[in-house]
Amino acid sequence: MLMEDADVLWYHTVEKLKREGIIRSEKVRQAFLKVPRYLFVLPEHKKWAHVDEPLPIPGGQTISAPHMVAIMLELAELEEGMNVLDIGTGSGWNAALAAELVKTDVYTVERIPELVEFARKNLEKAGYADRVHVIIGDGTKGFPPKAPYDRILVAAGAPNVPEPLVEQLKPGGKLIIPVGSYHLWQELYEVIKLKDGSVKVKRHGGVAFVPLIGEHGWKE
C-alpha cells in the first residue's frame, strides 16, 4: 500500500469518528491526523490500520480500535505541559498521541520485552522516540521516579483500581482505566483525585481490553 493511500484511508477514519461525536475536540482530531495508526501496526496489518477494530501486535496483545483510543483521550482532557504516565505501552501509539497533545515528555510502562522493542521502533519511525520514554516493568506499580502525574492512562483491564496509580496522581489529576472481568469485559473508569486525597469515580460504559497483569492487577 502506498503511503498516500494509507493517509487518505486514515483521514476518512478520523473524519468518521468526528461525525459520530467520538472525536469531540479539534486538538484530538489533529493529533490523530498527525500520528496515524498505520505507523504502529505490524507490516502485514498496515492495510487494515484504518479499520475501527483492534489489531494483533506481538506478545499476544492488541492495538486498540481507534474509537476506543479517542474516547480515552477525550476523557483525559490532556493539556500542553501535563505530566502523563501511560500504562501498557503496547505498540506505542497511545503514548505518541499523548505526547503530541501535551507537547512534552511522556513516560510509558510495558511488561513484555518484545513489545518494548516493538514500541521503541514504532516511536522512532513516527518521530516520537525523543519524547516518549518506554520503561520495562510492572505497570500496576506506576513509575514513581517521575510522579506525581496530571494524568495516568491505562490500556489494559484491571480487577480494581491499583492503589499505587492513585497515589502517584496529583490532587485534581485523573486516571483513565478499564476495571472489571479478566475475560475482555470491563467498565471504563474516570478516577479523579480530590484535593483531600480521596477519589471520585465516573463510569463510562462497557469496554473490552486485555488484562492488566502485575502485583496490583491480575496474576499471570
Swiss-Prot record:
Methyltransferase in keyword set: yes
Highest taxon, organism lineage: Archaea
Principal localisation: cytoplasm
GO MF entry, a single one: protein-L-isoaspartate (D-aspartate) O-methyltransferase activity
GO cellular component: cytoplasm
Database matches in SUPFAM superfamilies: S-adenosyl-L-methionine-dependent methyltransferases (SSF53335)
Keyword Cell inner membrane found: no
EC number of the protein: 2.1.1.77
Cysteines joined through disulfide linkages: none
Localization (cell): Cytoplasm
Keywords carried by this UniProt record: Cytoplasm, Methyltransferase, S-adenosyl-L-methionine, Transferase
Pfam families: PCMT
Example GO BP: methylation
Active-site residues, Swiss-Prot/TrEMBL: S64
Reactions listed under catalytic activity: [protein]-L-isoaspartate + S-adenosyl-L-methionine = [protein]-L-isoaspartate alpha-methyl ester + S-adenosyl-L-homocysteine
Family: Belongs to the methyltransferase superfamily. L-isoaspartyl/D-aspartyl protein methyltransferase family.
Annotated function: Catalyzes the methyl esterification of L-isoaspartyl residues in peptides and proteins that result from spontaneous decomposition of normal L-aspartyl and L-asparaginyl residues. It plays a role in the repair and/or degradation of damaged proteins.
Protein name: Protein-L-isoaspartate O-methyltransferase
Phylogenetic lineage: Archaea, Methanobacteriati, Methanobacteriota, Thermococci, Thermococcales
Gene label: pcm
